Amino acid sequence: NNAGLAAYKINSFNESIEYFNLCINKSPNTGYFYNNRGLSFQALKKLNLAMEDFNKCTSLDPKYPESYWNKSLLHLFQGNYKDGWELYEYRWQSFAKEWARDYPKKLWLGNESIKNKVIFIYPEQGHGDFIQCYRYIALLKDLHPKKIILEVTEPFYKLISTQDLEIEVIGPNIQPSKFDFYSPIMSLPLAFKTEISNVPNKCPYLLTNLNKNKIWEKKFEKSNYLRIGLCWAGNPLHKNNHNRSMLLDDFSELISLPFEYHSLQKGMTHEEQKIIKNSDVIDHQDSLKDFSDTASLIKMMDVIICVDTVIAHLAGALGKKTFLLLPDKSSFLWMNERKDSPWYPSIKIFRQSTLGDWSKPLKELISDLKS
């Protein structure tokens, strides 16, 4: 089993399946062997075999939460949102334990009226997840609660507290005032019974900070060139970062084209800073203090080209034309083989066909850009 997990980690999925087959032959009633093999099948896009394995695991071991969680992600990946969002609640028994909070008030999953009640929403998981589900705050307003209290992480405070939704925004570690219901933000798609056909995708649903806009506008001179914002790497701590992030070198052909390039990248390596210094790409990382800066910089661009990070979500939420580069093994949110996103109408997706090889999506993107 450990050898199979090790092979999976280095993207040797066929090899990992062989190891899990050995485990299953030796011990056919051990549920998590099927769960692990299912993940390998999913990585190879053998989705029916993956679901069979996850189902086999839950039938052998109904108390193994990881398998329900993996079923959730597979359903969502395939666009079966009804089952996917219901099973998504298993995250609290799986990897998301660290974000779980226990309040004496009632968890709201859409079943009770919140009219004239106070509801508290708190963040979980990544920055991109927060932006993706922030759209539901406007829908909560339509249910006429007495008040919505929204907790945000520090980098979002300035951006979210200046939106026009008339809600109470609090920073982290601030005790919310009295409330009747609470909900983690990633449970809102379930609460609003979200399916592919009714994803609330009216964009922009995020406004930039007017004061920040003025500051950023002063940094830019009039240009006849297409302005392109670039982001090639995500948070190195993300478990799929080795697949979803690119090297700056991968953009070498792209940045040789006659456009005006601006880097939206934070936390560049020493090597990347050297490359940027010797190129025509304009580096803004020292001016990007928080997401209100990033949003205003995105607003100044004509097109965003990025990998799967918070930048894609910010750009999509702002309604900015975005070219998103995805690995062959990508997040459930971007679904399977779609070139568009039901969540963000302004995003166009360019996917790898072989894991680790960015040449095909980059070639398609460059051809699109030239046209």
Where are these regions (language model features)?
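Alpha-helical solenoid repeat scaffolds of the TPR/TPR-like class and their adjacent stem/linker regions
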Residues: 1-371
